[in-house]
């Protein structure tokens, strides 16, 4: 908890203060710069609530409750969409309304999930002597969490570079990619939930020395992710405009809608690799090899950077549409052999541990 408080305060102050300079550095078009500063600045202001929810969700999953965090995640998504419609349509709050909708939904999700955690798990109620900061625990948590955080940061760097390339294409391209990305984020929430469930499942079964269950779990998760990816891609093909209408006026923004549909098409074709990427990455994290998961983020960053530098200048908007698919495929090419290697390493470790225990067991001679 103390680590979350410290990191959230530092990150909130830093990011809010640097919002405009970062957007200027990314060559954000002048006609949308002020609006972008308002929106992203308010989003950064909600960082403490994001930390709160993720801390609570991680604790719940570690205690064997993987369903409740999913319910709160769904609540956040539905509430966010509802508040978007309320603030933007009747209240006419525009960009500020969209940002506040996100902040409020994340705040409610974080606070309510924390209250639920405290009520359901009495073992977590803190006593007087337990509020002190444990340096040993902080070092251990940072050793696990920093590589995972770096993985997300590295992936985000690739996305920022890609966004810089899109910004050069103009405000229409930016609006199209933004609307399409929000639509994709809405549809890929279940995939992320499958991944987080696999992280917990893999870690628990590793603790029980049941790598056979880990393999079966990964195979089942891949099947579920593949079926969902295909189904969501098909649904998106027929209902893309309807879903995008949640984020923009599809009756007047004809050019943006057309570009957004094209972006969604090329990305949805590659939802299956995205699902596999998420399952393998979270499983590897759950098995304790977070550095490998971070290296997959490096592969994504390299792919997005290459697309931004090479394909976007050559192909324009179509090049930007290929950024996510290229990143997903690059990560999969790395993660699949990494997953196989991880399982073999753990098999060898568990076998060595069993042999060691057998050798240490005292030999009992039968009584005469």
Where are these regions (language model features)?
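Small-residue-rich hydrophobic transmembrane alpha-helices
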Residues: 1-13, 17-18, 50-69, 176-240, ...
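Short alpha-helical transmembrane segments in multi-pass integral membrane proteins
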Residues: 1-46, 90-146, 202-269, 311-368
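Residue-level hotspots within pore-lining transmembrane alpha-helices
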Residues: 10, 14, 44, 48-49, ...
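Alpha-helical transmembrane segments of multipass membrane proteins
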Residues: 13, 21, 55-59, 78-86, ...
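Hydrophobic/aromatic end-of-helix segments at the C-terminal termini of transmembrane alpha-helices
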Residues: 19-22, 83, 157-170, 198, ...
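Transmembrane helical elements of multi-pass membrane transporters/channels
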Residues: 42, 53, 76, 105-109, ...
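Short runs within selected transmembrane alpha-helices of multi-pass transporters and secretion channels
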Residues: 42-61, 69-77, 98-113, 192-195, ...
């Amino acid at each position: 908890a103390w680590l979350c408080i410290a990191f959230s305060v530092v990150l909130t102050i830093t990011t809010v203060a640097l919002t405009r300079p970062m957007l200027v550095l990314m060559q954000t078009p002048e006609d949308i710069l002020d609006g972008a500063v308002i929106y992203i600045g308010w989003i950064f202001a909600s960082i403490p609530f994001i930390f709160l929810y993720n801390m609570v969700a991680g604790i719940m999953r570690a205690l064997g409750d993987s369903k409740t965090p999913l319910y709160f995640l769904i609540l956040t998504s539905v509430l966010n969409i509802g508040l978007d419609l309320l603030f933007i349509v009747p209240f006419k709050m525009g960009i500020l309304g969209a940002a506040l909708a996100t902040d409020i939904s994340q705040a409610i999700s974080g606070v309510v999930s924390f209250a639920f955690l405290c009520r359901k798990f009495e073992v977590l109620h803190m006593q007087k002597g337990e509020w002190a900061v444990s340096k040993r625990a902080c070092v251990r948590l940072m050793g696990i969490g920093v590589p995972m955080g770096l993985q997300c940061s590295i992936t985000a760097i690739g996305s920022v570079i890609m966004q810089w390339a899109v910004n050069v294409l103009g405000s229409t391209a930016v609006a199209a990619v933004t609307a399409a990305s929000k639509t994709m984020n809405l549809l890929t929430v279940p995939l992320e939930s499958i991944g987080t469930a696999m992280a917990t499942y893999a870690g628990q079964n590793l603790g029980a020395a049941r790598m056979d269950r880990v393999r079966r779990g990964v195979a089942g998760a891949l099947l579920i992710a593949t079926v969902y990816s295909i189904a969501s891609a098909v649904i998106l093909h027929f209902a893309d405009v309807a879903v995008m209408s949640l984020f923009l006026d599809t009756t007047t923004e004809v050019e943006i809608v057309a570009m957004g549909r094209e972006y969604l098409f090329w990305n949805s074709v590659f939802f299956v690799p995205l699902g596999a990427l998420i399952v393998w990455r979270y499983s590897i994290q759950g098995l304790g090899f977070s550095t490998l998961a971070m290296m997959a983020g490096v592969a994504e960053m390299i792919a997005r950077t290459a697309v931004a530098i090479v394909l976007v200048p050559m192909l324009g908007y179509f090049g930007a549409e290929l950024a996510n698919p290229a990143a997903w495929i690059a990560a999969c090419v790395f993660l699949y052999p990494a997953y196989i290697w991880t399982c073999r390493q753990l098999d060898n470790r568990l076998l060595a541990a069993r042999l060691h225990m057998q050798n240490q067991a005292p030999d009992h001679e039968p009584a005469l």
